[in-house]
A protein has these predicted regions:
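PAPS/PAP-binding and catalytic site of the sulfotransferase fold
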Residues: 1-9, 51-54, 90, 171-174
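Signature of the SF2 helicase/ATPase Hel1-core->accessory helical subdomain module
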Residues: 1-30, 227, 232, 243
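Short, solvent-exposed loop/turn segments at secondary-structure junctions
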Residues: 9, 26, 85-87, 120-126, ...
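Inter-lobe coupling linker of SF2 helicases/translocases
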Residues: 13-133, 137-156, 252, 269-271
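Conserved RecA-like helicase motor-core motifs
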Residues: 13-16, 156-159, 172, 176-190
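Helix N-cap/beta->alpha junction signal
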Residues: 137, 162-165, 205
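Conserved RecA-like P-loop NTPase helicase motor core
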Residues: 168, 180-268, 272
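Long, largely alpha-helical accessory region at the distal end of helicase-like NTP-driven motors
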Residues: 280-285
Length: 285
């Protein structure tokens, strides 16, 4: 909000500089950790209200839910229990930075561990050259495909969000074996095919299909086979179905592996969502 407020004449003295303004209210939670990235958190001596109050009387916020007919939304979590072997390899990767995938031993660097852990919950890992190595099976991907198969069998269409290319390839292979029709953003007619009911499943990455697309005519059920770290991508991707013109209640199904980084990832995402909702509510007052 700093950029918008500064553009219309707010913030004075040292707060005219974004970096100074940020340093006033926030601190880098990753400072001293050796990480190459930053994670800014609100200082405990401040609240969101302290940021909003100086400009609140000049703010006007519109929430689409306040003036559009938005369908009811239900969020459903699927907490998948991995097999003992999968959990053993996951913990080996987490603590010892290497993993055995169907006889192939792979090592990872500490700074890449978090992303690698998420791929490991799906039963595969990328090496340093970007080559994917799979385990013999993936309980989580099997559960996702089983859910899709059941829903399609009941006449539903599924908008499936994935996080990794190998994850999408593996799911696509399984859908083919089940004779479930699908397409992706690589198909020039994917929007038309989806909205016309020509395919059972539309597979999308939230970074490539999460903004601006009108997909509400094609179905009302979304599946996250792997969740995103980005709140913006989460909200925008879900909004492809949660929008005016959707004539059925929307279901958002989130698949995550129990006792893994995905549980913390989902919790962090929901916390971000809560903070943003509180922030927007303050700007309405």
């Amino acid at each position: 909000i700093w950029g918008q407020a500064r553009a219309v004449g707010f913030f004075t003295n040292r707060q005219q500089n974004f970096w100074a303004w940020r340093a006033t209210f926030f601190y880098d939670a990753m400072a001293g950790s050796g990480r190459k990235w930053q994670k800014w958190k609100l200082k405990k001596c401040y609240t969101i209200d302290d940021i909003i109050r100086p400009i609140q009387k000049n703010l006007f916020t519109l929430d689409s839910a306040d003036y559009l007919e938005i369908p009811k939304v239900t969020y459903i979590r699927h907490n998948i229990t991995l097999t003992d072997k999968e959990m053993m390899e996951y913990m080996r990767l987490k603590t010892m930075l290497h993993i055995d995938l169907d006889g192939v031993m792979l090592s990872v660097k500490e700074q890449a561990k978090f992303a690698k852990l998420q791929t490991a919950t799906n039963g595969f890992l990328y090496d340093d050259n970007g080559t994917a190595f799979r385990s013999a099976y993936s309980t989580k991907i099997d559960e996702v495909v089983e859910f899709v198969e059941r829903a399609v069998g009941e006449g539903e269409k599924i908008l499936l969000w994935y996080a990794f290319r190998e994850e999408a390839i593996w799911i696509a292979e399984k859908l083919k074996k089940l004779d479930i029709s699908f397409c992706s953003a690589n198909d020039k007619r994917f929007i038309e095919k989806w909205n016309n009911g020509e395919v059972d499943v539309l597979m999308m990455h939230p970074a490539s299909g999460g903004h601006g697309l009108n997909l509400q005519k094609g179905g009302h059920i979304a599946v996250w086979s792997s969740i995103t770290y980005s709140l913006e991508l989460w909200l925008q991707a879900n909004a492809r179905l949660i929008r005016q013109g959707q004539n059925k209640p929307v279901q958002i199904h989130v698949f995550s592996a129990a006792n893994t980084i995905e549980v913390e990832q989902y919790r962090a995402l929901m916390e971000k969502n809560k903070v943003e909702a509180e922030f927007l509510e303050l700007t309405k007052q």
